[in-house]
Amino acid sequence: MTITRHAQIDWDEHGNPRSRDFSDVYFSTESGLEETRHVFLVQNDLRRRFTELQDGGRLIIGETGFGTGLNFLCAWQLFDECAPANARLQFVSVEKYPLSHADLQRALALWPELSPFAGQLLDQYVAVHEGFQRLVFAGGRVTLTLLIGDALQMLPQLDGQMDAWFLDGFAPAKNPEMWTPELFAELARLSTSSTTIGTFTSTGWVRRSLNAAGFKMKRVPGIGHKWEVLRGTFIAWPEDVAHPPAAKPWLARPAPIGGERKALVIGAGLAGCATAQSLAQRGWQVSLLERHAAPAQEASGNPQGVLYLKLSAHGTALSQLILSGFGHTRRLLERLQRGVDWDACGVLQLTFDDKEALRQKQLADAFPESLLHLLDKPAAEAQSGVALNSGGLFYPEGGWVHPPALCHAQAAHANIRLIAHQQALELRRVDDQWQVWSEEQLVDSAPVVVLAGAADIQQFSQSADLPLKRIRGQITRLPQTQASTALRSVVCAEGYVAPARLGEHTLGASFDFNSTDLTPNLADHLDNLGLLREISEDLTSRLDTADLSPEQLQGRAAFRCTSPDYLPIVGPLADREAFMQAYAALGKDARQVPDITCPWLDGLYVNSGHGSRGLITAPLCGELIAAWLDNEPLPLPRSVAEACHPNRFALRGLIRGKGKQTVGH
C-alpha cells in the first residue's frame, strides 16, 4: 500500500501557503474568502438551500481537494448562520496530501473571522491517516468525512449521494491526474437529478468533460482575478455510457424506515452506547435497554482498555476498519478527561520473536512514522520508562481508555433514555413495530431495533444464526508503587500492561475459549503475571509482585465476542430462511446475481462481534448503523462495510453448499 504523507508546503512573504508538490497556491492570496464564497457557496445556491432546510433536514456536500479546509469552514459558517437549529450539514472531502496539524493551524490563522469554526476543526484534527476519517462537530450537527488518498482511488469506494459538489483541487494544468473523465464519472455516480456543482476553472475541456459525464455546465462571471467560473447541475447518466454496476441485492440498502424516528438499542456496552449516540445526534429518540444497573458492566467495564492497532501491511478490510475506527475513537476521546478517562501515552508492541520482528518491519515500511515506527531497545526503554527485553513498534497516538467513561458520555445524550435492569428476551414484529418482550412483559416498541448485546443476541430467533462466539478474558489489577510510576507508555507482548490509572495498573489479558465462569480465578492471575514478566522483569520487580499473596490479586473477567473472520457484524438483518430460498441459485453458480430484493427484517440491525477491538471499531460502527438508517454516505469504504455485513455468513453457506446449516458453528 502507498504511504500517505503530509503536504509539502512553502510559505510566501505574506504567510500564504503554496504546495511544493503542485507548484500552486491553496487559495487566492488577494481574495481567498471572497473567491471561495463566490465559486462554491453562491454557485451551489447554498444560502437559499440552507435556509429552506426542514427541521431535521440535511444537506450533503462533496469536495475534491480539502486543502486547508477553507471551503468547508466557509460552508459551515454559512450553514450556522442560515440553517434551522436541528438541520445537519454533512461534508465529504477527498485529499491526497493532508496538511500537518501545525501547517493547518498556520494556514487557518490567516482568516480570523473563521476562527470559531477553525478552532473546532483543529481540536478534532488528530489521528488523520489513510482512508475514511470521520470528524464530528457541534454535537453531530456538522460532520466531516475526509477521504485521505488519491481521488481516483477513494471516490469509487464512497457509497452515498451528494446534494452539491465543490470541484476544487489545484489547477488542471498543475494537477492533470485529477481532472479526468474518470473523476467526473465518479462525481456523476454520486449525484442525483438535483445535485449542483461549482468549480473555479472555466477551461473548455473541463466544461465539455463534465457535460459528457451528465452535468449541464455553464460559464458565469467570476470574482477577483477569476474572469469566469463554472456552475452546473447533474441532469442524468449519459445514455451512451454503461451505468455503474448496482450493489448486489443482498448488500443493497434497505428501503428507508418512514414515520416515527424512534429506535431501541439492546445492550449498553461500547457498541450499544455508540449506536445510541449516533442515532440521537441525528434526532432519533432512543431507548437504550440494559440488563444491568448501568452501562458498561460486561466486556466494556474493564478499568483500562488499550488503543492498539493490529494492522496488516496489505490493506485488508479489517486493517482499513481499524485505521478509520482508531481515528474516530481518538477524536471522541479528546472530549473526555485526559489522565482519568483516557491517556494518549503511546503503545509499544515489543519484538518478542523473529516472526514478530518481520511483521513489524513490514508495517513500518507500509505506514507513516506519525502512525507507527520502530524503536531499538534503548529507545524503547527511554520511551516506556522501564527496562525491556527488546525494542519494538511504537504507536505514538495510541494509549489507554477507561471504557465506562466513553460509554457513559455517549449514553448521556438528551435523546437517549436508559432502561436499566431490563433483560430483553424476545422480539416480535407487530404493525410495523418491533416489540421487545421480557418474559410476558412488553418492555418497549419502535420501528427500529439495533442488537448490540454481544453474543447474547443469539437468543433472539431473528439473529440466532449469526456465528458469534464468546472468549473469556481476565484482567489483573495491580496497585501502583512509587517505583512503577516510571512506566510512561502501554507496553504489549503477548499481554499488556498500562500506566497507572487512579493508583492501579491494569494487566492482561487471558484468552479462554472454553470457560463460561466469569469468577476471577487465581490461575489466570498467575498467567497474567507471567505475561508481565515477558514484558519487563524490571517492571515486575517495581510492582513488588513477589510480595503479593495470591489472595490479594484483584481483577475481573468478561466475555469478548468475536466472529469467525474476526470482522464485526454490522448492518441490517435479513430473514434467514427467506434469504436461503431467494438466493438458492448461488449454491449452483456463485457468479449469478438473482434479481430478487433481499428479504430484510425491516428496521432490524446488528452491531456486534468486535472482539478485543471494541474500543477502536464499535464507535465508528455506530456511525455506520446510523448511515444505513438515514441513507447517508457511509463512513467506511463500501468494500469494508460489505465485509462487515451480516449477510456474508448466509451467503458463504449457500456458495459452499451448506444450505440451511448455521455457518461458522
From Swiss-Prot:
Spans annotated as FAD-dependent cmnm(5)s(2)U34 oxidoreductase: 266-665
Localization, UniProt: Cytoplasm
Leader peptide range in chain numbering: none
Positions of the UniProt region annotated as tRNA (mnm(5)s(2)U34)-methyltransferase: 1-235
Catalytic activity: 5-aminomethyl-2-thiouridine(34) in tRNA + S-adenosyl-L-methionine = 5-methylaminomethyl-2-thiouridine(34) in tRNA + S-adenosyl-L-homocysteine + H(+)
Keyword Transferase found: yes
One Gene Ontology cellular component: cytoplasm
MF annotations from Gene Ontology: flavin adenine dinucleotide binding; oxidoreductase activity, acting on the CH-NH group of donors; tRNA (5-methylaminomethyl-2-thiouridylate)(34)-methyltransferase activity
UniProt cross-references to InterPro entries, sorted A to Z: FAD-dep_OxRdtase (IPR006076), FAD/NAD-bd_sf (IPR036188), MnmC-like_methylTransf (IPR008471), SAM-dependent_MTases_sf (IPR029063), tRNA_MAMT_biosynth_bifunc_MnmC (IPR023032), tRNA_MNMC2 (IPR047785), tRNA_S-uridine_synth_MnmC_C (IPR017610)
SUPFAM superfamilies per UniProt: FAD/NAD(P)-binding domain
Entry keywords, A to Z: Cytoplasm, FAD, Flavoprotein, Methyltransferase, Multifunctional enzyme, Oxidoreductase, S-adenosyl-L-methionine, Transferase, tRNA processing
EC number: 2.1.1.61, 1.5.-.-
Keyword set includes Ribosomal protein: no
GO biological process terms on file: methylation; tRNA wobble uridine modification
The protein's required cofactors: FAD
PANTHER family in the cross-refs: SARCOSINE DEHYDROGENASE-RELATED (PTHR13847), TRNA 5-METHYLAMINOMETHYL-2-THIOURIDINE BIOSYNTHESIS BIFUNCTIONAL PROTEIN MNMC (PTHR13847:SF283)
Family stated for the protein in its record: In the N-terminal section; belongs to the methyltransferase superfamily. tRNA (mnm(5)s(2)U34)-methyltransferase family.
Known role: Catalyzes the last two steps in the biosynthesis of 5-methylaminomethyl-2-thiouridine (mnm(5)s(2)U) at the wobble position (U34) in tRNA. Catalyzes the FAD-dependent demodification of cmnm(5)s(2)U34 to nm(5)s(2)U34, followed by the transfer of a methyl group from S-adenosyl-L-methionine to nm(5)s(2)U34, to form mnm(5)s(2)U34.
Name recorded for this polypeptide: tRNA 5-methylaminomethyl-2-thiouridine biosynthesis bifunctional protein MnmC
Organism of provenance: Pseudomonas syringae pv. syringae (strain B728a)
